[in-house]
Amino acid sequence: MKFGLSMPIRGPLANAADILTLAQKAEVLGYDYLTVADHIVVPTEISSDYPYSEDGQFPWSEGGSVECMEQFTLLSWLAGVTDKIALLTSVTVVPHRNPLFMAKSLATLDQLTKGRINFGCGAGWMREEFEALGLPPFDARGKVTNEYIAAIKAVWTETRPTFDGEFVKFNKIGMDPKPVQNPHPPIWIGGESLPAMRRTVALGDVWYPFGSNPKFRMDTLKTYKARVERLHGLADEAGRGPASIGLAYNCAFHTDQEQEHMDGGRLIFTGSPEQRAEDIKRFADAGTTSMII
């Protein structure tokens, strides 16, 4: 099992001194990944349902905070203040940025870090942010995400790539240097829904669900294993070996205070260190290869 630590992009720790301390301490302690989330703007009025809370409310909206650091900038800064730890976008809202810009930026970072970049990808959930940024239609975000990822893979792996999609078109372009990692930086597909799982099978190297989505609960080992079985079934249907897909898990609700699950038992990853270590072991036994906290 590999472990990643989320870096703050907002709040009292979102400053150079504290992020530096957290990042370098995580590297010393043996963490495998530093992760950075993605918002470019935070509208002051949000009616879109946030997928990772029971009531659909976006927690950043409490108190009217709109603070957030930009993902690619912070990722680049982290690359410069660490030596060996891998870096993960967790996740990039893929429609937020031009795919060729993302491909070039991440390939450059992979070169400069000698292969430490991991590209976490999501389709996004906040309609208001899409509208503020002037992006392709929010309702087409799944198609846009799939096409952008495919285009990025093309420029990472082909000498003079051509792409003719609905949202991306280019012809025999040059995009060098290529990433250090062969064939490209690992692509982690975030999301718990069936479209996200299909995206993983078609385009991803790692499936990266968040355990706190109430529509697709994975806050017990049983529900997590059921979704993994569904993913493996989709892989079989597509002719892809399930073992070729890594399994990651974002654990957003860990705490040393034991909490009660809705079924009356203990919520996983809460409680004593021994209890949480046993939870981790059980997830590892189920095939999980990476956990982000």
Label every PLM stretch briefly.
Residues 1-293:
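Active-site-adjacent structural elements that line small-molecule/cofactor binding pockets in enzymes
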